[in-house]
């Protein structure tokens, strides 16, 4: 089950970005299973899906982990997005030096939205490199997200509510104006 408003989020934010001259792309970096994300109703909204996956046998049964994505492994995918090297088997180009002006998605143009502890390293890195990070909480317990603000892991903390007019919606729109 998705957070409220997720299914309409991508199209709406893309349209808003286009209205102010910002091309918006969405990527997901997840410790969850890629196959589950790819089978979801929102999969088509992502320019890239980076998640754990399996190797399958001839009967399409999972037989071995192909890719494991933990909290520290997530950061490499930010560099893949940054450099435009989305093929996870292409480590050579990923590790080659790329001048900042030739990077496809500069870090200051990134908005990282995280909803769990495995997102903390990515939120911190994006923030340190000039982008913005938003820590999400669900329910009324804001202790973790408040702490992320206090220790400079995130710029903003909001309810995991993607509906129009929500605090998250308004925060992302504001960040898109800064990027513009």
What positions do the PLM features span?
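C-terminal cap/substrate-recognition subdomain and adjoining C-terminal extension
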Residues: 3-180
């Amino acid at each position: 089950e998705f957070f409220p408003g997720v299914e309409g989020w991508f199209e709406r934010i893309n349209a808003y970005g286009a209205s102010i001259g910002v091309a918006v792309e969405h990527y997901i970096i997840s410790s969850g299973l890629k196959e589950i994300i790819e089978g979801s109703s929102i999969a088509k909204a992502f320019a890239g899906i980076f998640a754990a996956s399996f190797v399958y046998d001839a009967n399409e049964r999972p037989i071995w982990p192909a890719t494991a994505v933990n909290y520290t492994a997530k950061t490499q995918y930010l560099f893949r997005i940054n450099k435009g090297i989305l093929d996870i088997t292409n480590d050579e180009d990923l590790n080659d030096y790329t001048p900042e002006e030739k990077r496809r998605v500069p870090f200051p143009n990134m908005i990282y939205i995280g909803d769990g502890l495995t997102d903390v390293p990515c939120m911190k890195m994006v923030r340190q490199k000039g982008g913005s990070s938003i820590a999400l909480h669900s329910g009324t317990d804001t202790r973790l997200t408040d702490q992320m603000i206090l220790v400079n892991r995130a710029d903003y903390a909001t309810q995991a509510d993607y509906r129009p007019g929500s605090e998250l919606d308004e925060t992302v729109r504001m960040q898109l104006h800064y990027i513009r």
